């Protein structure tokens, strides 16, 4: 009976250690995924600001060209 109790205790202890290690690895993976998501959102934000600036400059240039064309008439 004592042998059975020790075996069960050992199995439970090893299971808890294994579970603890798995959860720690899971947390590390989630942290890495969050960093990747943050990097991707920063890239998208930078891309959209660049597109916005190019569009703004194009609109200003088009407006100046239109005013110049109206002024010549």
Curated annotation (Swiss-Prot):
Species for this entry: Pithecopus nordestinus (Northeastern Brazilian leaf frog)
Expression tissues: Expressed by the skin glands.
Spans annotated as Disordered: 25-46
Family: Belongs to the frog skin active peptide (FSAP) family. Dermaseptin subfamily.
Stated name of the protein: Dermaseptin-1
InterPro entries given in the database record: Dermaseptin_dom (IPR022731), Frog_antimicrobial_propeptide (IPR004275), FSAP (IPR016322)
Subcellular location: Secreted
GO-annotated biological processes: defense response to bacterium
Acidic residues composition bias: residue spans: 30-40
Modification Leucine amide occurs at: 70
Signal peptide feature range: 1-22
Positions of the propeptide removed during maturation: 23-43, 72-73
GO cellular component: extracellular region
Cited function: Has antiparasitic activity against trypomastigote form of T.cruzi (IC(50)=0.68 uM) in vitro but not against L.infantum. Probably acts by permeabilizing cell membranes. In vitro, shows no cytotoxicity against macrophages. Has antibacterial activity.
Keywords recorded for this protein, A-Z: Amidation, Amphibian defense peptide, Antibiotic, Antimicrobial, Cleavage on pair of basic residues, Secreted, Signal
């Amino acid at each position: 009976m004592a042998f059975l109790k020790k075996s069960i205790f050992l199995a439970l202890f090893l299971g808890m250690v294994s579970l603890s290690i798995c959860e720690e690895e899971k947390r590390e993976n989630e942290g890495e995924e969050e960093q990747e998501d943050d990097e991707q959102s920063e890239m998208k934000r930078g891309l959209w600001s660049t597109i916005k600036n190019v569009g703004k400059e194009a609109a200003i240039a088009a407006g100046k060209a239109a005013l110049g064309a109206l002024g010549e008439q």
